[in-house]
Amino acid sequence: MREEEAAAVVTVPQAGRDGEQPGPPAGLGCAAVRGEPGGGGPQESRKQWKKFLYCEPHKRIKEVLEEELYIKRDECHIKHPPAVALEGIWSIKRNLPVGGLKPGLQSRNSLLPQAKYYSRHGGLRR
């Protein structure tokens, strides 16, 4: 969103009051909305636009909200540390055959993954 769009929020046009006819915001390029000749008729040119300015919350309110966000994030990390959470899902120790081999008996083929076959009748087979 551009800065001009963030500063002014435009609502539906209302019928003109006191003969004022301010133009629509700069971001709208439709001829019918602007009330330009040949683009919507005289009724469109009599409508007035309401503008609302966005005001940020007070600095202290923003700080309190950020503190609450950080507290919730820290509580989540204490309950479920990322390393421990992943350990339950996938583990090198459990999923890969590493270690347990004697250094003198290692061969090239023993380090390769062994073929595993699944059968719906017998389960997992090697």
From Swiss-Prot:
Keywords: Cell projection, Cytoplasm, Cytoskeleton. The keyword Nucleus does not apply. It is found in: Cytoplasm, Cytoskeleton, Cilium basal body. Residues 1-46 are annotated as: Disordered. It comes from the Eukaryota. GO terms for cellular component: ciliary basal body; ciliary base; cytoplasm. This is Uncharacterized protein C11orf97 homolog.
